[in-house]
From Swiss-Prot:
GO cellular component term, pick one: extracellular space
UniProt keyword Signal, yes or no: yes
Name recorded for this polypeptide: Intracellular coagulation inhibitor 2
Site note Reactive bond, residues: K372, S373
Subunit structure: Monomer. Forms a covalent heterodimer with clotting factor C chain B. Forms a covalent heterodimer with proclotting enzyme heavy chain.
Disulfide topology: C50-C249
Subcellular location: Secreted
Molecular function GO terms recorded: serine-type endopeptidase inhibitor activity
Keyword annotations: Disulfide bond, Glycoprotein, Protease inhibitor, Secreted, Serine protease inhibitor, Signal
Length: 408
């Protein structure tokens, strides 16, 4: 027969075990919810930005994930109205993701996106270049290192700008397997204090590959009107497919080997402008389209294509409500404890190559964080070219000496 003491111990252990399991379940639910919210935010941010980029009327390729990652590395250091604007512009407010939950959400995303030995290859890398001897808060560095897996590397933007440029481009080339060989073509400003970088690389083989022998020159109708001969790939197989009567478009999924990643094609009817579909899309509608896909025997014909793009991101982010981050009113005191930093520019490059074997894509994003001025908004006076001078008596107001220097 169990003693009272033994029963008490068993009861305590049961309570502790139950509480521990409840806590684990709570944290798992919270983690799942945070990841779902991050997915919604990144996708919605990408769709909002895509609409604006498409106004240029050109082919586009960019990485919502890469841009969102680099900008979020800055966002976690934002405070006040700067943080409010960035949270809204990056889609976090709409997705219900608080600023303090963003680092953990990205941490979980990086875990899920890790490549294994089978299927497609996806690599993501972050790095933060910091001006030598510039004081960055340990709390900010911890978030970058532990949650964003970011290296933190001291560099000298002031005296070694050319070397920094070459080092950045070499890093970009290495991560993207030479698909993108440069991000910056000249040294960054000597006032740069942080350069937050993200690079992503993807390579996947189609689960069902196209036969090169079936690739032929066929007409592709630009803007549904002007015809041009391009290489078109064809195959017949079962693929996830649907037709959406509201958007009046066909939706096709081509999976990559390993079934972890796939390419989704959205093809409007001939009499429907692509812009109509683009304007109607949202993170929720994309999710719904994917949920409606059903395995269907179908004849697929798509073009081989390569795209490269370096969109001017900054102006579109401002249109999307992120104004203060780029102004002298910016508050990034979560980075260094002071309000003397602002985002000077956001750089982005992306490419994709689609052929019979599969697809290869890469993107790189950079957020340039600068001092608002060299000396806390004081004007600078550098007499390094011809000037005049005079010596004046302040009491009498008379000029005692007057001259000019033209050569030294």
């Amino acid at each position: 027969m169990l003693s009272r003491r033994t029963l008490d111990c068993c009861l305590v252990m049961l309570i502790v075990s139950t509480t521990f399991c409840q806590e684990l379940h709570f944290y798992k639910e919270k983690a799942d919810r945070s990841h779902e919210n991050l997915k919604t935010a990144v996708n919605q941010f990408g769709i909002h930005l895509c609409r604006r980029l498409l106004n240029e009327g050109k082919n586009i390729i960019f990485s919502p994930f890469s841009l969102s990652t680099a900008l979020s590395m800055a966002f976690v250091g934002a405070r006040g109205n700067t943080a409010i604007e960035m949270r809204s512009g990056l889609g976090f407010r709409e997705a219900g993701l608080a600023q303090e939950d963003v680092p953990d959400s990205f941490y979980q995303a990086f875990q899920l996106l890790k490549s294994d030995q089978s299927g497609d290859k996806f690599y993501v890398a972050n790095t933060a270049l910091v001006q030598n001897n510039y004081n960055i808060l340990n709390s900010y560095k911890r978030i970058l290192h532990r949650k964003f897996y970011s290296d933190i590397q001291p560099v000298d933007f002031v005296r070694n700008g050319l070397w920094v440029k070459e080092m950045v481009n070499k890093w970009v080339s290495n991560i993207t397997h030479n698909k993108i060989t440069s991000l910056i073509d000249k040294p960054l400003s000597p006032l740069t204090r942080l350069f937050l970088l993200n690079a992503v690389y993807f390579k996947g083989s189609w689960k069902t590959q196209f036969d090169r022998k079936r690739t032929t020159l066929s007409l592709f109708y630009n803007n549904n009107k002007v015809a041009r001969r391009v290489e078109m790939m064809s195959l017949t197989n079962k693929f996830p497919y649907t037709y959406d009567s509201e958007l009046k478009c066909q939706v096709l999924e081509l999976p990559y080997d390993g079934d972890k990643t796939s390419m989704i094609f959205i093809l409007p009817e001939w009499d429907v402008r692509l812009k109509h579909v683009e304007n109607a899309l949202s993170a929720q509608s994309v999710k719904q389209l994917i949920n409606n896909l059903q395995d269907t025997e179908i004849v697929v014909t798509i073009p081989k294509f390569k795209l490269e793009n370096s969109p001017q991101i900054k102006e579109y982010l401002q249109v999307m409500g992120m104004n203060e981050a780029f102004s002298f009113s910016a508050d990034f005191s979560g980075m260094n404890g002071r309000r003397n930093l602002f985002v000077k520019d956001v750089l982005h490059k992306a490419m994709i190559d689609v052929n019979e074997e599969g697809s290869e894509a890469a993107a790189v994003s950079g957020v340039v964080v600068m001092l608002k001025s060299a000396s806390h908004n004081l004007p600078t006076f550098v007499a390094n070219h011809p000037f005049m001078f005079l010596i004046i008596n302040k009491e009498s107001g008379m000029i005692l000496f007057l001259g000019s220097v033209r050569e030294l």
